[in-house]
């Protein structure tokens, strides 16, 4: 799973507490920017010059093979089922954007955010690993997805699927996160 792992952990902890566990610690992290890419066609090697079929796990994880739908199509089906108009979805998204911006601006979660910095991790016998931020970025201290918007900006965005209600402005972002 790649979405809502923090919420899933809270749900599981709640079940365990209900069943008698005295203490539950929930930690979740999602690194969408470092999602792996795999090659499944290399078991017998590659022919020189032959193309290699790579599969992006991110897009695979955003697609549910049981009904044959991606996450946006699932959201569109739910919008149709519950009679949600584009205007209603954009209004809800605007409210969410405004609350997130107000919370970030007020510093409500400032004590809970740990800055991510360029860092190297080394252990004898292993290759060094690390975190490398873009040039001229010393640290990431805020959620980069939260930014001001208005209803007109949301309303002018093109729907992802023709005739649908989901847009880049009212859908969940594909970002790194932790809970």
Regions found by a protein language model. Give the residues of each.
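Active-site-proximal alpha-helical scaffold in enzymes
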Residues: 1-30, 79-109, 177
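Conserved catalytic cysteine-centered active-site region
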Residues: 1-23, 65-71, 147-173
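Phenylalanine-focused residue identity feature
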Residues: 7, 46, 54-57, 109, ...
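Flexible glycine-/small-residue-enriched beta->alpha junction loops
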Residues: 14, 23-78
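Charged, low-complexity, helix/coiled-coil-prone segments
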Residues: 19-45, 124-126, 159-175
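Short amphipathic alpha-helical segments at helix-loop
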Residues: 56-60, 77-85, 163-167
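N-terminal extracellular/periplasmic Venus flytrap/periplasmic-binding protein-like
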Residues: 88-179
